[in-house]
Structure formats: structure tokens, C-alpha cells
């Protein structure tokens, strides 16, 4: 019985971390575009969220969550964020991943680049297209080149632009 509590704790910790990480990004999108119909079925959005959920759930549990527990984190996080059936959204995301959906994979790649840049683990980061674009925009606006501001610009140039293009 103690083992079950351990798994529950990891799922809870992972879900809390996943929701806390993505909520400000979703909030920014809702502020600018409302909550577009179909956002919780959009391949790019789901890929971006799944990768973000995975990253923060693994960080929060020190890598001790995977498999079905991670799937439960996805379902719980989607339920909390969307007020819809998170398990259904997770099944769709799983299908998109299995089908190698190009938009889903782009969302995953963008979220991975942002997460790795934040952790300073992105290989050849100066030449990564999203980082380079964010730095060019920051320089053009004469903004600070602090890492946190580059991360914010990366989110705008990837997730926010994608939402605007699809739903704006």
C-alpha cells in the first residue's frame, strides 16, 4: 500500500509542476485571443503542452515518473487547464504522436528548445533557429538579452504566433 502512495505523490507533484509551468503561457494566449474553439484538439498546442508537461513533471519528481504515471499527469493537467476530459485529450495527443503528426512534432520541438535553453542544455544554442530569431527580435527592440527575456521571446515567437495564426 505504501508503494501506491508513492506513485500518487509523484503524479500529484508532476501534475502540479506541469500545470504551474504551462498556466502562464495559456493565460497569455487567453488574454490575447480568448479561448478559441478547438484549442484543446490542436496538434501543435497538444505537442507543445505534452512536452512542457513531461519536462516539468520529470524535473519535479527528479526523473522518477514515467509511463502510465506520466500519462495520468497529462490527463490531470489537461483536465485542470481545460475543464474538459483530460483523458480524452491525452488519448488524442498520444494518437498524434504515434501518427508522427508534423504539427504535433513541431509543438514538441519548440517546447523542447525552450526547456533546454532554460536549463542551458540546448546544443549549439546560438545557432538554434528559435533562439537566433528571439535574439534578433530582442536586439531590434533594444531589449535586454537576459536569458529569461530570451525565453519569453521564444514563447511568443513559437506558441503565441502559432495560436495567432491558427485561431487569431
Predicted regions and their residues:
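Short runs of predominantly hydrophobic/aromatic residues within well-ordered alpha helices
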Residues: 15-18, 37, 41-49, 71, ...
